[in-house]
Amino acid sequence: LTTEFEIALTLLSAFIVATATMPVAKAASLYFGILARPSPDHPHDKPTALLGGLAVMAGFVAAIGLVGFLSRLPYHSIPWLAAFAIAMCLVGLLDDIVDLKPRHKLYLELAAISVLVWWGPHLDFFPYHAVNIALTIFWLVTATNAFNLIDGIDGLAGGVGIVAALSIATVAGLHQHTGTMVAALAIAGALGGFMVFNFPPASVFMGDEGALAVGLVLGVLSIQASNGGEGSLPARLAMPLLALMVPILDTLTVTVTRLATGNPVSRRGLDHSHHRLTRLGMSSNRAAVALIGLQVIAGACAIALSLVPGYDAILLIPFMALFFALVALFLMDRSFDAEAPGQLEDLPPIARVILS
């Protein structure tokens, strides 16, 4: 198969399968009562189906299976990725059904990710294997949960995921890493099918089973795309972060503000990036568009770094870091934390600096 045909077939097959199976997932969600009910965390008008992630995974697995069979590409770890994405999907499904405690969910994630890293892809940045393994596990746990945390308003997680997947696919394609490119295009196409049903007002949500699985897939593919390049170490380290910049920034700002104000990091709250933007007066739709636009900028930076030869990329990294640091500081505001334990002057000095 030609590369152009692989690209078109992957996107189209993933989109068609996800779109075709989404009504089935929605019907199953309604039948079994696996619903997101209206609450401060879910500000929608009526109970909404939560099993959209199952259809996303169906589209992803079907597309990589079809294209892999027809093109007979050496996919290496892609079958393992599909298997463990399904395993993570089951962890999320269990959470959607019984509402797991955060630490129990983390234990299950760590178990699945540790086995995946043992058998499959891992970072190859450093000469010490144990360091690469530990960093890979940390990155995949972070990426998996960070993506799950931005799934808070209609269209946001799906849109950010599509942009992230397309940027990863572009970087992988530039470095002739065809297996990674096909897998990234498959998740982008499947998320496109999901977005048909998730445009406001959404009739189905991704659910934890979808968000955790997609986050894991994007985390793994960002590693593979970075490993496939020949750029400098700083550029290769920056690429996965840029590919998932919006979820990472959201997790970073929420973690820092909660620690600074004495709140548990694992609590549920209305202090995520999309909540902060809506508190500024944006509609949910405009907040989603703004954050997706930020991910477009980050994805373009990832692609740009992959095109800059050798250590010349180091000249670009400080400017990118400054831009996203300013965005993070803009999002850190004590007024958004409804459960801050006291007045600003009562907080530790570091908290006063960050939150002023």
Annotate each PLM feature.
Residues 2-251:
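"…together with the soluble PPM/PP2C metallo-phosphatase catalytic core" -> "…together
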